[in-house]
Structure formats: structure tokens, C-alpha cells
Amino acid sequence: MATEFQTFNEDLSLTSQTECEDSARAILAKLRPEWTSSEIKFEYFSVGITNKIFSAGFGTEHVIFRVFGHNTSKVIDRENEVTAWRQLAKHGFAAPLYGKFNNGLICGFLEGKSLKIEQMRDSRFHMNIAKRIAQLHASVPTNGKTLVFEKMQEFLKQLDPKFEDATKQEFFVTNFPQNLAAEIEKVEKLVIKSKEPVAFCHNDLLVHNIVFNGETKRIEFIDYEYAFPNYALYDIANHFCEYAGVEGTPDYTKCLTKDEKWLFINDYLHFKDSKNHCDVRMKAMYKHLPLFEATAHLFWAIWALVQAQNSTIDFDYLTYAHARYEQYEKRFQKYIGSVNHH
């Protein structure tokens, strides 16, 4: 079976299933020449809110096609995605990457099913998720520099201060500050001051990106579009924000309790470095947690504003951006309150 990374000059249609499958067959004729074209079976997964994802199967073998959503290169660095993915695959944290086409990637199939939100909220899964995050942070090398604030500023450059739709424009002006760049800088100063360590992070551990293999009982992460070196605590904080769910309006009352967050951080530290696991580190992480939750909310709020202007996917990005921005303000104030209190 060919394992070297291959490039294909094909565009897969986001709108026509027939055209999309014809292009996929053309790619598979080169990537998997031993597969009988007419017997290839396609199965669609539409859980991502950015891309179109489907599998192509022949016999017991499968490969996954990820077709990038319209205009997503405005919010995703595709070069970085390939580099990060290959590095993660090398360390056993991602399915193998077989190749790329003009508007997407082809990768291996990870056995298992994405967690459902009820499962993710089940405390029995928390330890396994914490363990896998710890393993990721401990295993993949970085240069110690984070890109998270740079990415936010890049998103802002893509954001047009004027929405074409008057109703959307009014909503934007009413619910968001004029100077979002100042918000980023305000948070960045405090985050740098926290001196939290940097690790190679997934940065998007929502429910769809966490796969559980019922046979091996292992947790795996998928979808490394936003993977880059970042503060380790950001990865955890961002994951905590995702307990609210993605579909419809997020429900932040469903997030973990203080005690559950404490236990999760305790498990994470135990698996990451059991020899140096101490209360001081634990308390520092817990103290800084609202600041990093605020950072994650701000990141996705700005991301969603850009998506609201560019994405063709049927999702109310503007309402989502507002929900995230409100949480950003709440978590930021909680952090400021706790710091001033001590």
C-alpha cells in the first residue's frame, strides 16, 4: 500500500455529490489502483461545521476525504495543517495523511466513534480525555513559541467592519466592541504574565473531534486544522468551554463544575509528569483557568465573525460569535475579580 504523500490536481465539489464522487474515484485510481472503481462505497459524515467529510471504502479498507469548506483558508492555515498533521502522525497522535488535492486532504481511518455530548459529560470519560491531552502535550516537540494571539490578529485582518446585510451589521455594532484588537492585546498581556508552559496543542477539542474506540477503550483526537504550539492550559480551557455543545446555541450551564475541573487538571498533571505533580502547580493552573477560558472564547468569537462573512455552510455564525463573546467577558471578569481579590 502506497504510503508516500501524494498531490492530486483535482477539485472536489461541495455541492454536487456525483461530481464529488467522480473526482474522488479519479484520485483513488492513482492512490489505490488495486481498488475496483465501481465497487467503492462512499459514506458521508457531516458533523464538522467547516468542512465536508466522507469515507471511501473498498472491502475492509477505508480512506477519509476532507473537503475544505468555502473560504475556510481565511481562518485555517492549510500549510500549517499538513505540517502539523504529519508531525502528529509520526508521534502516533493522528491517522496517516496520504495526500492532498486542490481543496482538501486524504487520510487514514481511525476506528471508533466521535463522542456524543452526553458521553463527554460522563465523568468516566474525563480521565481518559485528560490522559490523552497529557500524552499529546508531553510527546510532540515545539519551539516554545505560541501562535494563538497572532492567529486572532490574522482573523481580525480578514474581518470586514461592514456586514453587507443591514440586520447583521446592526447586530454586530450592538453586540461587539469597535476595537477587538484592544481586547486581544489586553488578554495577551495577562496570559504572558501567567508564565504558563507552551506545548503542542490540538486547540479544538470539541465533542466531534474526540473519538472513542469501544474495543481498545482508547480515546483519540481527530481534526488537526487548528493544531499549533500553544499554552497547554489553553487546550484544557478550550476543551472545558466545549461542554456547552456546538449545535444551536451553546448551553454554558452544561459545563463542568469547579470540582470536576479540579479533578480533570489533577488527572492531566498526574499523566503528564507524575514525578513533579504538586499542589502548587495545580493551584496555579486552576487560578489561571478562567483567563485561558476567556482567551478560547475570544478566539472562537472572532473566528465565527469571519465565518459569518465568508462561510456558505448553513450555520448561524453571528449568534454563535455573540454567545462566545458574552462568555469571554464573563470569564475575563471572573479572572480579574479573583486576582484582585487575592
Residue positions per predicted region:
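Active-site acidic catalytic loop and adjacent metal/ATP-binding pocket
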Residues: 46-65, 185-240, 245-247
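ATP-binding pocket architecture of kinase catalytic cores
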Residues: 43-179, 190-197, 215-216
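Short proline/glycine- and basic residue-enriched helix-capping loop/turn segments at helix->loop/beta transitions
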Residues: 180-184
